[in-house]
Amino acid sequence: MATASDQNLREILEYDTIAVVGCSTTPGKAAHDIPKYLIDQGYDVVPVNPYADEIFDRVAYDSLLDVPDEVDLVDVFRPSEEVPGIVDEVLERHDQRGDVEALWLQFGIRDDDATQRAADAGIQVVQDSCIKVEHQRLK
């Protein structure tokens, strides 16, 4: 899968609502601090974590499929071996609800086969890249 161009990244960063799969309740962890940064930048962040009821004073959902509102971008902070299941949920939302325009896998997270399925469905994909780093670089 090709690396996203700066123009593609800028387009993805224009989305408003970001579901963060693996969002953490623990300050100091990337899965907490990066979503907090995104909130501070004006994004509507939706935490997805089955072990938390609330993160950042927002409802935390058990799975991506439980999020009732429209989601533009899914940002993933889970191990690479969990990506195929996450992509299944992304594709189900995309097919049934017509949302999820982009999938972003954070540093160290990669699965070419699973993300190719998302790309084949017309979803923009970024792998092994930090959304905060790219936001700071491009915005």
Question: Language-model segments: what does each one mean?
Answer:
Residues 1-13, 139:
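Haloarchaeal acidic low-complexity proteome signature biased toward cell-envelope/secretome components but also
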Residues 19-21:
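Conserved beta-strand elements of the Class I
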Residues 24-28, 37-56:
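NAD(P)-binding Rossmann-fold cofactor-contacting core
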Residues 26, 33-43, 78, 121-124:
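S-adenosyl-L-methionine-dependent methyltransferase catalytic core, i.e., the SAM/SAH-binding region
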Residues 58-63:
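Conserved SAM-binding strand-loop segment of SAM-dependent methyltransferases
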Residues 64-108:
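Mid-chain, well-packed structural core segment of small domains
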